[in-house]
Amino acid sequence: MEEIQRYLQPDRSQQHNFLYPLIFQEYIYALAHDHGLNRNRSILLENPSYNNKFSLLIVKRLITRMYQQNHFLISTNDSNKNSFLGCNKSLYSQMISEGFAFIVEIPFSLRLISSLSSFEGKKIFKSHNLRSIHSTFPFLEDNFSHLNYVLDILIPYPVHLEILVQTLRYWVKDASSLHLLRFFLHEYWNLNSLITSKKPGYSFSKKNQRFFFFLYNSYVYECESTFVFLRNQSSHLRSTSFGALLERIYFYGKIERLVEVFAKDFQVTLWLFKDPFMHYVRYQGKSILASKGTFLLMNKWKFYLVNFWQCHFYLCFPTGRIHINQLSNHSRDFMGYLSSVRLNPSMLRSQMLENSFLINNAIKKFDTLVPIIPLIGSLAKANFCTVLGHPISKPVWSDLSDSDIIDRFGRICRNLFHYYSGSSKKKTLYRIKYILRLSCARTLARKHKSTVRTFLKRSGSELLEEFLTSEEQVLSLTFPRASSSLWGVYRSRIWYLDIFCIHDLANYQ
């Protein structure tokens, strides 16, 4: 039991009283602002407006106000007035939330460094760019030959603000920072402004995404740490963490090791977790749990998770938020893809003496397809085509130079191919490329007051080369006449680690 208690109390940050003074440093807000600019890149928008009002002068004014300690005292007689933020309440609150989120991530970064240093003699790649979206890649590439059912889970919300603060108490041993967090949440925010429940999953306030993502990830980590603990104590393939919570979840690598289930008090529950063929992944506000068990076993999982969230987090969690689906008959919108299980048939010939046998074996594998209708809808919303997919010109870009117009269209096309490089079939992407190329040609023809045919004859191959993807460019230079290599690119699935920056596709509903 002592080992269980040690596991349930993970290796928290041991730093004390060093975070709060950073809230008064100007460079913290500058770093947080630059980080936000780098994270808010867009595919279809060339100049996303992150925060045009940021300036060091406003930061100095904010820090001056924070130095006046009496403004942090909550007065019961004057609760409706807010002399601390003044007339710039929205801007100041956004800056405080960004700066605070940047500061409280420091203990997690320190824990990441310590976890990486524990691997002696192993070369670990720099994982500061890892996000939970990257954990979906091995999930989509896994072999699901023995899996039958899948649990589609909507992670419960809303969580009480005080529970979020108490969760951070185990990570951030800085009472002043926690008091500031509690004051900030209860004085300037309510839960409805941070989360909206109009759509399935989570919809975060656009002005304070990083701040609430951090709180939300802390809460989800508490859920998943207990879940992983129960899984580890019963599985013959024990999971060992090799990265720290950066922005979403843990990443786990499996090693073969027989473990003894010593937790006698958990024997009634642990028998549910003895299935070694189990796959779990989380993306945004959803979780997916696949298992080879029967429908009865998955139903027990469902009620266990409901009771866990209700008892541990005091949440009213209806059972309708967890759906049990048969893996072979269910498709889902997942990470911007339309995912379903595809059966890959394979024929084996076996010969014993004079007799030969043909063995037909079907392997289950996730098939990731490009959702053509939502993608054309996004292009139509950005005025690249009609809702039916017919290319149109973009008049707002007609004042730009020819090279800028071609560069913008080409960059959008390459970004789309870059994000959907994990697709099993890329035929849809070439249709999108056709729409963008013709839209670019129509825009240029409109600018020069000529027809599309005339402009294409004059431009030659220059317009075609601008829309080549990075893989096609490499193959065209290496194997200029090898069409089979291009066919291999068409069929292969490639996952890039930087696709989490592309918010238009990763977060579309």
UniProtKB/Swiss-Prot annotation:
InterPro entries linked to this entry: Domain_X, Maturase_MatK, Maturase_MatK_N
Predominant cellular place of this UniProt entry's protein: plastid
Keyword vocabulary terms for this entry: Chloroplast, mRNA processing, Plastid, RNA-binding, tRNA processing
GO biological process, one term: RNA splicing
Location(s) in or outside the cell: Plastid, Chloroplast
GO cellular component, one term: chloroplast
Gene Ontology molecular-function annotations: RNA binding
Similarity comment: Belongs to the intron maturase 2 family. MatK subfamily.
Function: Usually encoded in the trnK tRNA gene intron. Probably assists in splicing its own and other chloroplast group II introns.
Name of protein: Maturase K
